[in-house]
Amino acid sequence: MTQHDTIFSKPLPSISDFCFDQQVVEVFPDMINRSVPGYSSILQTLPQIVSRYVQPNSHLYDLGCSLGAATLAIRKGCEQTENCKIIGIDNSQPMIERAQLHLDGFKSQIPVELHCQDLAETEIKNASVVVLNFTLQFISQDKRDEVIQNIFNGMNKGGALLVAEKVRHPDESMNDLLIELHHNFKRANGYSELEISQKRAAIENVMKVDTLQAHQQRFQKAGFQHSSVWFQCFNFAAMLAVK
């Protein structure tokens, strides 16, 4: 059973950089649903998009798979396609171990492999669908072009890249507004001012967000022919790029 997120509910003498450790694993489903507007809508829509782009005899990747919620959505989207394999990657061993338990609870004929490794070092091959669900924002900005290029190089023609991210608006006044609307969303979901401020302090050094334009330029630079935002709520957006 998912535990309630209280990690930042009490004053901390010092705030360490946020990391996906065992403490976060225990509360992650509650944390992400109360923190990311539209998260459930993105997961619910993933199978529909995956089903349009999955190819027989191909691989589907969930890069930064955390507890496997998107992995399950990907699997649902390829149920009618022959000989597919899903590969989930995460650099947090506690996340991978819990994801395996989660996936084992939902049996399927579609094989899923989970690997604990750095996605920047993951070989992508024979891919029809690759998902980065709130993952790229935690990768060093100087490595993001290389990550997307690596995905493109290992993707089959007609394949799809699905990227969901927190984004920054280029207009500072609009960006401030979207941040405040996001904080209101968290307040409405029970987070206190202390929790919001301490979480922000913990995450500001490890999560660097790009503008939508930067993402689209990165897709184009890698070689993707088409890209579009397919969902946005406040400063959280989901994008699709097609090879």
From Swiss-Prot:
Catalytic activity from the UniProt record: prephenate + S-adenosyl-L-methionine = carboxy-S-adenosyl-L-methionine + 3-phenylpyruvate + H2O
Coiled coil stretches, renumbered: none
Question: Binding residues for S-adenosyl-L-methionine, per the UniProt record?
Answer: 39, 64-66, 90-91, 118-119, 133, 200
Q: Which GO terms describe its molecular function?
A: carboxyl- or carbamoyltransferase activity; S-adenosyl-L-methionine binding
GO BP terms: tRNA wobble uridine modification
Q: Does the keyword Hydrolase apply?
A: no
Role summary: Catalyzes the conversion of S-adenosyl-L-methionine (SAM) to carboxy-S-adenosyl-L-methionine (Cx-SAM).
- Assembly behavior: Homodimer.
NCBIfam families, sorted:
carboxy-S-adenosyl-L-methionine synthase CmoA (TIGR00740), PRK15451.1 (NF011995)
The UniProt family comment states:
Belongs to the class I-like SAM-binding methyltransferase superfamily. Cx-SAM synthase family.
Record-given protein name: Carboxy-S-adenosyl-L-methionine synthase
Q: What is the lineage of its organism?
A: Bacteria, Pseudomonadati, Pseudomonadota, Gammaproteobacteria, Alteromonadales
Instruction: Identify the coding gene.
Output: cmoA
